[in-house]
C-alpha cells in the first residue's frame, strides 16, 4: 500500500488557543499560528469549535475565514448550534466528531451506526451549504459502511488507539485495523483521511498507507513548535510524511 503520490497535512491549531485560554489573554494567537503553518507547507488548517468553547472561539473561526490561503477543516459536534455556525461560515471541510464535556480530547470515533438518520441529515445540510463533510470514526468496517450510507464523501480514521498502544503486539493489531478500515473505505467510494495522536515517531507508518489522502495533526506539532518554532515543526512533519511515500 505504499505509493509515491503526495499526502496532505492539515495542522490543528486548537492547542495554541488552549494556551491562550489558560490565562484569558489575547496571545498566543491561533490565527498567527495558522498563517505560519501555511507558510511552512500546511495544506489546510483544522480547528475544533467545542460546545464548551474550551479553546477555539467562534471569533477565531470568523477571523480564519478571512485570512486562510489553503482550506479550513472545522471539527464540531452534531448539534443544531454547530450546524448553524458551519452554515454561517461555510468552511471548505467540516469533520463531525463525538463530544463529551468531561473528556480531555476526543476519545473515540463517531457512532454513525447508532445515529444514522441524524448524521445523514447533518450531511445533507452541510452539503447544501457548500461544505464537504467528513466523519471521524473508529477503524471499524461497520462504521465505514454506515458513513457511506449517510452520504458523507470523506471519513477520518481515528488513529488514537494505534498511537496509544503500550506494546508492539497491540500496536500491530491496531495498525491492521486501520489498514482494513482504509481498504473498506476505498471499496465503498470514500476519501480516507486519518488523525489523532500522531506524532514525529509514529506518523511514518500511517503516512505510508497509499490510500490515505490527508493526515490531521495538532498536539505534537504545537508541542514541537514551543521549542523549534511553528514553521520548523510543520516542515519537519511534512518531511516525515513525504519520505514515508517515497
Curated annotation (Swiss-Prot):
GO cellular component: cytosol
Keyword Cytoplasm in record: yes
GO molecular function ontology, one term from the record: pyridoxine 5'-phosphate synthase activity
Documented EC number(s): 2.6.99.2
Positions annotated to bind 1-deoxy-D-xylulose 5-phosphate: 14-15, 50, 55, 105
Annotated metabolic or biological route of this protein: Cofactor biosynthesis; pyridoxine 5'-phosphate biosynthesis; pyridoxine 5'-phosphate from D-erythrose 4-phosphate: step 5/5
Keywords carried by this UniProt record: Cytoplasm, Pyridoxine biosynthesis, Transferase
Cystine bridges: none
Keyword Cytoplasm set for record: yes
A biological-process GO annotation: pyridoxine biosynthetic process
Database matches in Pfam families: PdxJ
Binding site for 3-amino-2-oxopropyl phosphate: 12, 23, 197, 218-219
Cellular localization per UniProt: Cytoplasm
Active site: 48 (proton acceptor), 75 (proton acceptor), 196 (proton donor)
Site positions per UniProt: Transition state stabilizer: 156
PANTHER family cross-referenced by the UniProt entry: PYRIDOXINE 5'-PHOSPHATE SYNTHASE
Family label: Belongs to the PNP synthase family.
NCBIfam families linked: pdxJ, PRK05265.1-1, PRK05265.1-3, PRK05265.1-5
Name this protein carries in UniProt: Pyridoxine 5'-phosphate synthase
Organism listed in the record: Nitrosococcus oceani (strain ATCC 19707 / BCRC 17464 / JCM 30415 / NCIMB 11848 / C-107)
Amino acid at each position: 500500500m505504499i505509493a509515491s503520490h503526495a499526502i496532505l497535512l492539515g495542522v490543528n491549531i486548537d492547542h495554541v488557543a488552549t494556551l491562550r485560554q489558560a490565562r484569558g489573554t489575547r496571545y498566543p494567537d491561533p490565527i498567527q499560528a495558522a498563517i505560519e503553518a501555511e507558510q511552512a507547507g500546511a495544506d489546510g488548517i483544522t480547528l475544533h469549535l467545542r460546545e464548551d468553547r474550551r479553546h477555539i472561539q467562534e471569533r477565531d473561526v470568523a477571523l480564519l475565514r478571512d485570512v486562510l490561503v489553503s482550506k479550513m477543516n472545522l471539527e464540531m459536534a452534531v448539534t443544531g448550534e454547530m450546524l448553524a455556525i458551519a452554515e454561517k461560515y461555510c468552511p471548505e471541510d467540516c469533520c463531525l466528531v463525538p463530544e463529551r464535556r468531561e473528556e480531555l480530547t476526543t476519545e473515540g470515533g463517531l457512532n454513525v451506526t447508532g445515529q444514522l438518520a441524524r448524521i445523514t441529515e447533518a450531511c445533507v445540510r452541510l452539503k447544501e451549504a457548500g461544505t464537504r463533510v467528513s466523519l471521524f470514526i473508529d477503524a471499524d468496517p461497520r462504521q465505514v459502511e454506515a458513513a457511506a450510507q449517510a452520504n458523507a464523501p470523506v471519513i477520518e480514521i481515528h488513529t488514537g488507539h494505534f498511537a496509544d498502544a503500550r506494546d508492539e503486539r497491540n500496536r500491530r493489531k491496531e495498525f491492521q485495523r486501520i489498514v482494513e478500515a482504509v481498504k473498506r473505505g476505498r471499496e465503498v467510494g470514500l476519501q480516507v483521511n486519518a488523525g489523532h495522536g500522531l506524532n514525529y515517531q509514529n506518523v511514518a507508518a500511517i503516512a505510508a498507507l497509499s490510500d490515505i489522502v490527508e493526515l490531521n495533526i495538532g498536539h505534537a506539532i504545537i508541542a514541537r513548535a514551543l521549542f523549534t518554532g511553528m514553521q520548523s515543526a510543520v516542515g519537519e512533519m511534512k518531511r516525515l510524511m513525504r519520505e514515508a511515500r517515497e
